[in-house]
Amino acid sequence: MKYIAIDLGLKRIGLAYSAHKDLVTPLKAVERKNRDQAARDVKKTLIEWEVDAVVVGIPLGGSSEDEMRRRVAHFMNLVAFEGEIFYQDESNSSIEAESMMRGEIKYIRDGRIDSISAMIILQRYLRQKC
């Protein structure tokens, strides 16, 4: 099964891909100018990589969980993805990503950290599933 993970942010959307449970690759992040443009760009990536399922990171257990689920559901509606959508706890994934990249891109905001976060989210999902 082919997966893409999405780390949905206000400025950038991190993406990561896996066709095998032991290998997850960060992809180029989507710059988010507006919702419609971001949804089109994400959909294009999903089609290009021929994915079967999407794993979306959401913060579980916090007071904002319901609101985030609503926002994610709205965004995925705009993407109009026909495959399966799974949710995975994204807690601390950005902190982990920054720790992994420490020193390399401290001041660069090009989406690499966002896509590393998506990679971590997908790794967590695949570890729990398999």
Swiss-Prot record:
GO terms for biological process: rRNA 5'-end processing. GO terms for cellular component: cytosol. Signal peptide: none annotated. Transmembrane segments: none annotated. InterPro entries: RNaseH-like_sf (IPR012337), YqgF (IPR005227), YqgF/RNaseH-like_dom (IPR006641), YqgF/RNaseH-like_dom_sf (IPR037027). Its EC number is 3.1.-.-. The keyword Cytoplasm applies. GO terms for molecular function: nuclease activity. SUPFAM superfamilies: Ribonuclease H-like (SSF53098). It is found in: Cytoplasm. Its main location: cytoplasm. Keywords: Cytoplasm, Hydrolase, Nuclease, Ribosome biogenesis. Belongs to the YqgF nuclease family. Could be a nuclease involved in processing of the 5'-end of pre-16S rRNA. NCBIfam families: PRK00109.2-2, RNAse_H_YqgF. This is Putative pre-16S rRNA nuclease. It comes from Sulfurimonas denitrificans (strain ATCC 33889 / DSM 1251).
